[in-house]
Each structure stands twice: as C-alpha cells, then as structure tokens.
Amino acid sequence: MLRDLHRVLATIIAFLFISMMGVAYRYRYPMQASSSPHPEPLLVCRPKTNIVFLKTHKCASSTLMNIFLRYGMRHDLNFVLPKSTFTHYIGHPTPFRRTLIDDITKYNMTFNILTHHTRYDGKEMHKVMPPDTVYVTILRRPDCLFESLYSYCHLADSYKKNLSAFVEDKKLTRALTRKRALEGRVGFNQMSYDLGFNGLLRSKPESITNFINSIDRAFDLVMITERLDESLILLKHLLCWNTSDVVAFKVNARYAEYKEELSADLKKKLSDLNHADVLLYRHFAELFERKVREFGADRMAAEVQELQAARKAYYAKCVEAEQSLDVVSTKLKRKDVVAFKMKDKSEECRHLTMSELDFHELVKAKQKERINRLQHSRTSR
C-alpha cells in the first residue's frame, strides 16, 4: 500500500515539475492492460506533433486526414505540401521525393505533419521529417476497397463494364495489371502500391513477405478501417492526444445506393486479383487484434463509447443536414459522396465538415501566410 502511494506521489511530483517548465504534458495509463492487483501508475506523456500519415486510397483515409489537418491547424504546425499548384497529391505514382514539396526549411521552418496522398518512400521521408516522427497508416479489406475504388474512380466508364463483368474479363484484368489506371495511380493491390510495393500481381511470396515485414518495422501503428473507432483510440494513446482530437465525421464516403453488393464469388475473385493486399491486410489485422487485446477489452469499450458520444455531440452542434458533395464543395462535383451542411459557423465546425480539397486549399493558404509573416518580421528588424 505504501509502495503504491509512493508511486502515485512520484508521478504527481514529476508532472508538477515539468508543468513548471511550461511544456504541455498529459496523464496516460499504459497502453497495455495489466493483470497486476496493484494499480498502474499514471504515465506522463507529451503530445506528439511530428507525424506521417500514409494516406491509402479508399480506406477512410480522408477521415483520418481531416483529423491531422485540424490538429495541425489548431496548433500552428507545418505541413508537407505539394509544390504543384494543380493537384493535392505529392507525386503518385512517383514515390515521395523532396523535390516534389514546398521547401519550408529555407525559412528555418521544420516539417511536422505529412498527410497528403503520396507513395511511401521511407528514406526520402526521413530526409524531411524530424527523427522523432510517428508513422501511421490504415488498411481495409481488399475486396471492399477495390469495389469502392472501381466506383469512386469511375472505372466502369473507362472499361465499359460494371465490376462483376470487369472481373470476368481476363483481357481487361490483365490490362489493369500491366498498366494502372488514372495516370498510374490506381489498380490492383492498391494499398501495397500506396505503401511503396512495385511487385506484379503474382509476385514471389518472399518478395511480398519482405515488403510486409518492412512496413511492420517502419510504422508505429497500422489502423484497420473495419475497426475505425478502436483504431482511433489506439491512435489517441500513441500520440498522447485527447478524445476531441480524434473526433471526425466520415469524409468522402459514398451513399449506400452507389455501393455494389459483393457476392461470395466476386469477393473471392477480387481477393485473387489483390493477392498482395490480402496478405498485407491479414498480417496487420492480426497484429491489430493483439494490440486491442493488450489494451484491454473493458477499457477499449469504455473509450470507444466516450469517442462515439463526443462525435454525436459534435454532429448535433455542427451539422444541419447531410448533402451530396456537389452541393457543398467548391472543388468536387460528386453526387455520390456524402457531405455536410453546417449548422454552427464556428471554425471548429467548419473544419470538421470541410471537404478534403477545400481543406487542402485552406491549409496551403494559411501556411503561405505564415511564411510571409516570418519573412516580413525578418526584413523589418
């Protein structure tokens, strides 16, 4: 009993000391649940601000991107942004390169968050991101992902066939295997491709295994779309953020009427065509389950409930109605995508309901303003 009291007192004293230093720290329980009869001491952690979120296509990654953009805007952090003025992609299909981004280091500024679409290249990213950067990404069931990709990217218009007919056409599937669609950006094994894998449909098993192991070593957390709320809880604790920081509405989600129901046969054929993605997803889905178990079932359930309550409260405050994206956004004319009509006009609600492209434009403008202020202050000295 006395030993437990000493541990608690030591934690409080440490927290008071670092608080006096003017640094924002927070209490956190350990990530892994403990079976010990003694109470676990509260950990003191500092919120992480240097983050790479590798955005994977059609994996709820736009929802995650909204979280990182909001956090960065709120804390005046610096984003890795494309040099190009006509796309919000950084390269892709070209992998990430320093030459593709706005170089803010020449203004003695440091990059904090990379969350825009790009293809993973760890060596190049390490050259621009701080050493303590946290790397995260998200994966989705490959059959569901490809259905979403085929619909969202209007591949039925390109191939003149719906998804079921396309999968049966070996000539068309071979063509997409040889040459990816939309200027090389989308195709089979999309998640593996986004994460830097260059293998063909039937790559040697060892090359896929080596690729998966390299991603396992490089990333601190791989989230799972089908377990999004639990993923957000693990993300919250990894980054030492608050629940409100990881609240988000679904961004770029399609209306149900635009989704194709997948038969068991179609699921199998899509899995065969996305073999590398199936192995990638299986590995990290199993790893995710272990992380959730280590976190503790009761603890996870309580935190998910807290997150859902917070999301519901923000939705009631911020959203008057759901509308199609073509009504809300100035950038995308999409009738199949859900967007939000704001109720509350606060900045917080504006950012929560903002479309991806509109948010990109806002972030780019704000960062340019920050650079201009910095240059002005230096020249006026």
Residue ranges and their predicted role:
Residues M1-S35:
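N-terminal signal-anchor transmembrane helix specifying type II single-pass membrane topology
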Residues H38, T85-I138, D143-V247, K269, ...:
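PAPS-dependent sulfotransferase catalytic domain
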Residues A60, M65, L69, E147, ...:
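Amphipathic alpha-helical interaction motifs in eukaryotic regulatory proteins
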Residues A60, R141, D277:
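Short, conserved catalytic/metal-binding motifs centered on acidic residues
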